[in-house]
A protein has these predicted regions:
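Membrane-embedded and interfacial regions of multi-pass energy-transducing membrane proteins
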Residues: 1-583
Length: 583
C-alpha cells in the first residue's frame, strides 16, 4: 500500500533517498549542473575558434593561468574539448536521460511501487555524483585535465609524458569513467529486472508505453557494452602504471625509443568503439521513446505502427553492436571488412526510417497541441532525419577517408546525437515536470526556449558540414594558420556567434526550471489528458506511488480519440466496454 505518512529525515529523503522519484530528480539536477559546465567549456573554445588570438576577459576570469591575458592556452583548448565531449556524451546525455526518466517513469508506467532494488538505485546515483565531481576536479590538477580527446586514444592517453594533461588529469578521467560505468551498470540491471518482474496486473509487454520499451532496450545495450569500456580502461591503466604494452609498440619520444613493443593502439579503438557506437543509441533511444509518448499525446492519435516502433527499437539496438568499425575506416583495415561495416551501417537507416515515417504519420491529420514538449519532440524528428542523412554519407568508406576527423563529422554527430538527445531530454522535462515537482513550467518561456535553441543549434552545426567539406580538421587550435582553410575562415565567427546565443538562451530554461519548482502554478493530476499510469498517481508524491491497491491495466497506452468513448483519451485502467476490442 502507498503511504502518505512515511516519516523521513532530511538525509534519508533528499540525500540518500531510495525512492525512485527523488533519485530521478537527483540525476536531473546533477546533469543540469554538469551541462552548464560542459556548455561553458564549449563557449570558451568557440571564442578562440571564432576569433583566434583575441583577448577575452571572461577567459582569464574563469581559466586563470590557462588563459594568460585573456587568450586561451593551446593545451587548455585541447583539455576543454576533451572534457566538454566527455561531459556532454556521458554525464548529460546518458545519465541525464536514462538516469532521470528511467527512474521516474519505469515504476510509474508499469504500475510498480518502486524499483526492484532501491538500495542499488541509490548507489547508482552516488557513483554518478562522485564520478561527476572527479571529472570536474580533474580540471584543477597540476598539468591540466585530460587532453587526448574524449575518445582518449593511445599513445597520448597512455604515456604521462606525452603531453600536458596526460598525467594526473588523465588518471582522474579514467577513474571517473570507471565509476560512471559502475553507476550505469547498477542502474541498467535495476531497470531490466523491474520491467520484467514488477509489471502490474494486465500490463503485458505489448501494452507497455514506448518509453518503457526504449528504456528496456537501452538498459540491455548498457549492460552489454559498458563493461568493454572498463576492460579497455583497465588495460590502459596497466600500460600507464605497470609497464605493460597492450596499446604501445615502437614509440619514440624526443628521439628516444621507449621500452614497449608488441601492443597496438588499434586494439584500444576496437574496444572503445564497441561501446562507442551502442553509446550513440544509449543516448538516442530514450529520447526517441520520450518523443513517441509526447507526439502521441499531443496529436490525440494512437501512435502509428506500435509493433513496428518496438521492432525498430530492437533492430537499432541489435545493429548498433555490429557497426563499430565504421569509426575506423582509415586504420588500414581489410577493404572487404570495411565493406561489411558499410553494409551493416547502412542497414540502420531502415529501422531509423521506420521511426521517422511513423512519427510523421502519427502527426498527420492529428488534433495537434503545440506544447513546448511537442515542439521539442518535432524538433527531434527534424534533427534525427537531417543528421541521419549525413550519416549515410559517412557510412561510405570511400567518402569517409576524406571526411574522417573533419568538421563534417562534428556537425553530423552533434545534430543526430547531440541535438536529438537534448531535444528529447527537454521534451521529457517539459512533459513530466508536473509529475516530478507538482508544479507547471511557464509555457511562453518554453516556446522562446525552443525557437532559440533549434535556430542556434542548426546555426552552429549546419555550417560545420561546409567547413568539413573544405577539408578543415577538427580540434585545430587556430585554423587561420593554414592557407587551405582560408575559404571557410569566415564561417567560424558565425558559428561562434550562434553558439554563444544558443548557450545564453539556455538561461531561459534554467530560470523557468528553478523558478517553477518553487513558485510555479500548482499542477493538476493529468494536465495533458494522457492515458498512461503515471497520471493516475496523486500530484503529491507518496511512497508506493498509489495510495491503495496497484492499478489494473485493461488496454494499451495509446487509446486516443477512440470513438467508443466520449473523451479523446482513455486511461489504461479503464475497463473495456461491451463489444470494444482491446490491444
Amino acid at each position: 500500500m502507498g503511504n502518505t505518512n512515511h516519516k523521513e529525515s532530511f538525509v534519508s529523503k533528499y540525500v540518500f533517498s531510495q525512492d525512485h522519484k527523488m533519485i530521478s530528480k537527483q540525476f536531473l539536477i546533477t546533469a543540469i549542473f554538469m551541462g552548464i559546465a560542459g556548455v561553458m567549456m564549449s563557449v570558451f573554445f568557440r571564442l578562440q575558434l571564432g576569433w583566434p588570438g583575441e583577448s577575452f576577459a571572461i577567459l582569464e576570469t574563469f581559466m586563470g593561468k590557462w588563459a594568460p591575458n585573456g587568450v586561451l592556452d593551446r593545451n587548455a583548448y585541447l583539455a576543454l574539448t576533451t572534457i566538454h565531449g566527455t561531459i556532454m556524451v556521458f554525464f548529460v546525455l546518458t545519465a541525464g536521460l536514462s538516469g532521470t526518466f528511467s527512474n521516474l517513469l519505469i515504476p510509474l508506467q508499469i504500475g510498480a511501487r518502486d524499483m526492484a532494488s532501491g538500495f542499488l538505485n541509490m548507489l547508482s546515483y552516488w557513483f554518478f555524483a562522485v564520478s561527476s565531481v572527479m571529472m570536474l576536479f580533474s580540471l584543477l590538477v597540476e598539468g591540466g585535465a585530460a587532453s587526448a580527446g574524449w575518445t582518449i586514444y593511445p599513445p597520448l592517453s597512455v604515456l604521462p609524458q606525452a603531453m600536458p594533461g596526460s598525467g594526473m588529469g588523465m588518471t582522474l578521467w579514467l577513474l571517473s569513467m570507471t565509476l560512471f560505468v559502475v553507476s550505469s551498470l547498477l542502474g541498467s540491471l535495476n531497470y531490466i529486472v523491474t520491467i520484467i518482474n514488477l509489471r502490474t496486473k494486465g500490463m503485458s509487454m505489448t501494452r507497455l508505453p514506448l518509453t518503457i520499451w526504449a528504456f528496456f532496450i537501452t538498459a540491455i545495450l548498457g549492460v552489454l557494452s559498458f563493461p568493454v569500456l572498463v576492460s579497455a580502461i583497465v588495460l590502459l591503466m596497466m600500460d600507464r602504471m605497470m609497464g605493460t604494452a597492450f596499446y604501445l609498440s615502437d614509440i619514440f619520444i624526443g628521439g628516444e625509443a621507449l621500452d614497449a613493443t608488441g601492443g597496438s593502439p588499434i586494439l584500444f579503438q576496437h574496444l572503445f568503439w564497441f561501446l562507442g557506437h551502442p553509446e550513440v543509441y544509449i543516448v538516442l533511444l530514450p529520447a526517441l521513446g520520450i518523443s513517441s509518448e509526447v507526439i502521441a499525446t499531443n496529436s490525440r492519435k494512437p501512435i502509428f505502427g506500435y509493433k513496428a516502433m518496438v521492432g525498430s527499437l530492437m533492430a537499432i539496438g541489435f545493429l548498433s553492436f555490429i557497426v563499430w568499425a565504421h569509426h575506423m575506416f582509415i586504420t588500414g583495415m581489410n577493404p572487404f571488412l570495411g565493406s561489411v561495416f558499410v553494409f551493416t551501417t547502412l542497414l540502420i537507416a531502415i529501422p531509423s526510417a521506420v521511426k521517422a515515417f511513423n512519427y510523421i504519420t502519427t502527426l498527420w491529420r492529428g488534433n495537434l497541441r503545440f506544447t513546448p514538449a511537442m515542439l521539442f519532440s518535432i524538433g527531434l524528428v527534424s534533427t534525427f532525419v537531417t543528421g541521419g542523412l549525413t550519416g549515410i554519407i559517412l557510412a561510405d568508406s570511400a567518402l569517409d577517408v576524406t571526411l574522417h576527423d573533419t568538421y563534417f563529422v562534428v556537425g553530423h554527430f552533434h545534430i543526430v546525437m547531440g541535438l536529438s538527445a537534448i531535444f528529447g531530454m527537454f521534451a521529457g522535462v517539459y512533459h513530466w515536470f508536473s509529475k516530478m515537482f507538482g508544479t507547471m513550467l511557464n509555457t511562453k518561456l518554453g516556446f522562446a526556449h525552443f525557437w532559440l535553441t533549434i535556430t542556434c543549434g542548426y546555426g552552429v552545426f549546419f555550417p560545420m558540414h561546409f567547413v568539413g567539406l573544405a577539408g578543415a580538421p577538427r580540434r585545430y587550435y587556430n585554423s587561420s594558420s593554414f592557407d587551405f582553410l582560408s575559404e571557410t575562415a569566415d564561417l567560424q565567427p558565425i558559428i561562434s556567434v550562434f553558439a554563444i546565443i544558443g548557450s545564453l538562451s539556455q538561461l531561459i530554461f534554467l530560470f523557468n526550471f528553478f523558478y517553477s519548482i518553487f513558485r510555479g502554478q500548482k499542477a493538476v493530476q493529468n494536465p495533458w489528458k494522457s492515458n498512461t499510469l503515471e497520471w493516475t498517481t496523486p500530484v503529491e508524491h507518496i511512497h508506493g506511488n498509489w495510495p491503495g491497491a496497484l492499478p489494473e491495466v485493461h488496454r494499451w497506452a495509446y487509446d486516443y480519440s477512440n470513438p467508443v468513448h466520449e473523451e479523446d483519451f482513455v486511461l489504461q485502467t479503464t475497463p473495456l466496454k461491451d463489444g470494444e476490442v482491446g490491444h
